[in-house]
Amino acid sequence: MMILTIVVLLAANILATPILPSSPNATIVGGVKAQAGDCPYQISLQSSSHFCGGSILDEYWILTAAHCVNGQSAKKLSIRYNTLKHASGGEKIQVAEIYQHENYDSMTIDNDVALIKLKTPMTLDQTNAKPVPLPAQGSDVKVGDKIRVSGWGYLQEGSYSLPSELQRVDIDVVSREQCDQLYSKAGADVSENMICGGDVANGGVDSCQGDSGGPVVDVATKQIVGIVSWGYGCARKGYPGVYTRVGNFVDWIESKRSQ
């Protein structure tokens, strides 16, 4: 998954994420190719090419990570949607405005949430283009819940090529307390604005560079509960992926969408 070195973004228009010993924008490690309709809310955020993921909230609004848009100019960005491929198919739409959370901290990667408003509306209710529902404000995941992470990130740590087709993986939620204890050894903090997921004992399943900003969806409720944010390496044993806790930002999201 992404790696937070407590430094910040690395090559914003290549992969954009926070880093530790690797880099933040993750892709899916240990997953499978997504099939039509598996993740219809997934979009590719692009400059000259794919660099982050995002999630469809409605015809105009995309949810992504703050670190993905940090320092970015809206006029240079577009999204591709309604396709399983980040480089072809579907439709591209230009970005009109970027709303980065006011309290985003690029050192701790806290409040890692942003909204993107599009210039023209998407055509939704297609097999690969549907909005994802938000959870209730203040809601949280439970240990052991199954969550689905998707994206076009690297398939393994140290890889430098993105898969052409969308990947997905279902993982288990890890307790915030355990996650914080594990990351404290690397000098990082897991806040109440974050959730964690993966296989702590064995590793092998995670997001990786290129997945940043993408959706983390509760398999049971189909609601978006997380945003791919950061991590230590990709799918490393003892280091679960860390995701923005969407439940803590629903009021913020709705306030921006109503402006």
Swiss-Prot record:
Keyword vocabulary terms for this entry: Allergen, Disulfide bond, Hydrolase, Protease, Secreted, Serine protease, Signal, Zymogen
Disulphides: C52-C68, C179-C196, C208-C234
Principal location: secreted
Top class in the EC scheme: hydrolase
PROSITE patterns given in the database record: TRYPSIN_DOM, TRYPSIN_HIS, TRYPSIN_SER
The protein, known as: Mite allergen Der f 3
Domain Peptidase S1, chain residue ranges per copy: 28-258
Intracellular or extracellular location(s): Secreted
InterPro entries registered for this protein in UniProt: Peptidase_S1, Peptidase_S1_PA, Peptidase_S1_PA_chymotrypsin, Peptidase_S1A, Trypsin_dom, TRYPSIN_HIS, TRYPSIN_SER
A Gene Ontology molecular function term of the record: serine-type endopeptidase activity
Gene this protein is translated from: DERF3
Site, Required for specificity: residue positions: D206
PANTHER family on file: FI18310P1-RELATED, POLYSERASE-RELATED
Family according to the record: Belongs to the peptidase S1 family.
GO BP annotations listed: proteolysis
Propeptide: 17-27
Keyword Hydrolase found: yes
Active site: H67, D112, S212
GO cellular component, one term: extracellular region
Signal peptide, first to last residue: 1-16
Species assigned in the record: Dermatophagoides farinae
This enzyme's EC code(s): 3.4.21.-
